[in-house]
């Protein structure tokens, strides 16, 4: 059952109303009651059937104002790339010792970047990393020889997103403490990329719903007209 604060917050939102994005941002800020700096999330309902490979929507986007979160990064590479990764700001850098650590159950990072020449060995831990969304992937730019660029992008606010089985995409787009304009810019950048990635196999209306919420807050529906494609 929802807590008292959540129920009180929900009364401040018109349930059947779609808010303009700027209004929705202010509403989420108003109803967030957490003592910590809550993350703002966007949820997008898409008219796709992710059971079909040609309707899977996945991608990355650079949020202009970052996520507000300190992202911890592990780079798995051979010695020749290790210094480059460290200088770019990677929190952990290594090769076989980290594969062993992961096999033993360690997954204490937000993002893993790997060079192509270690992907064979990384396959040993794919079953551990895959379900946690940590397996490096060339499509998301986390399998690359340019480890410095990849580390800097992730640290600066590059996020990865993927449609789930129900046809929804969720993404963190900043913190409640962010300036409203900065949140707006981040959200628009994310939504534009989702729209750009519309699969040609998708039938009917592509964007079917957009909602904004923060950690432990009710969600606020957003008007879709500017983002329907």
Curated annotation (Swiss-Prot):
The keyword Nucleotide-binding does not apply. Gene3D superfamilies: 3.30.190.20, 3.40.50.790. It holds the Pfam family Ribosomal_L1. SUPFAM superfamilies: Ribosomal protein L1 (SSF56808). It comes from the Bacteria. GO terms for cellular component: large ribosomal subunit. GO terms for biological process: regulation of translation; translation. GO terms for molecular function: rRNA binding; structural constituent of ribosome; tRNA binding. Part of the 50S ribosomal subunit. Binds directly to 23S rRNA. The L1 stalk is quite mobile in the ribosome, and is involved in E site tRNA release. Protein L1 is also a translational repressor protein, it controls the translation of the L11 operon by binding to its mRNA. This is Large ribosomal subunit protein uL1. It comes from Chlorobium chlorochromatii (strain CaD3). The lineage of its organism: Bacteria, Pseudomonadati, Chlorobiota, Chlorobiia, Chlorobiales.
């Amino acid at each position: 059952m929802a807590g008292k604060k959540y129920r009180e917050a929900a009364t401040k939102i018109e349930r059947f109303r779609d808010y303009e994005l700027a209004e929705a941002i202010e509403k989420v800020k108003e109803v967030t009651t957490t003592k910590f700096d809550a993350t703002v999330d966007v949820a997008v309902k898409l008219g796709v059937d992710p059971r079909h490979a040609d309707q899977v929507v996945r991608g990355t986007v650079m949020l202009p104002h970052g996520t507000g979160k300190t992202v911890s990064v592990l780079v798995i590479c051979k010695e020749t790339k290790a210094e480059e990764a460290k200088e770019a700001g990677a929190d952990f850098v290594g090769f076989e010792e980290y594969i062993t650590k992961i096999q033993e159950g360690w997954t204490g990072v937000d993002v893993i970047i790997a060079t192509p020449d270690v992907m064979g060995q990384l396959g040993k831990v794919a079953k551990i990393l895959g379900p946690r969304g940590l397996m490096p992937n060339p499509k998301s730019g986390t399998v690359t020889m340019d480890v410095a660029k990849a580390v800097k992008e992730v640290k600066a606010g590059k996020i990865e997103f993927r449609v789930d089985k129900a046809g929804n995409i969720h993404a963190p787009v900043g913190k409640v403490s962010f300036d409203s304009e900065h949140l707006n810019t981040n959200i628009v950048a994310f939504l534009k990329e989702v729209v750009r990635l519309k699969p040609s196999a998708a039938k009917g209306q592509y964007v079917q719903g957009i909602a904004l919420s923060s950690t432990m807050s009710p969600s606020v529906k957003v008007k879709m007209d500017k983002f329907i494609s």
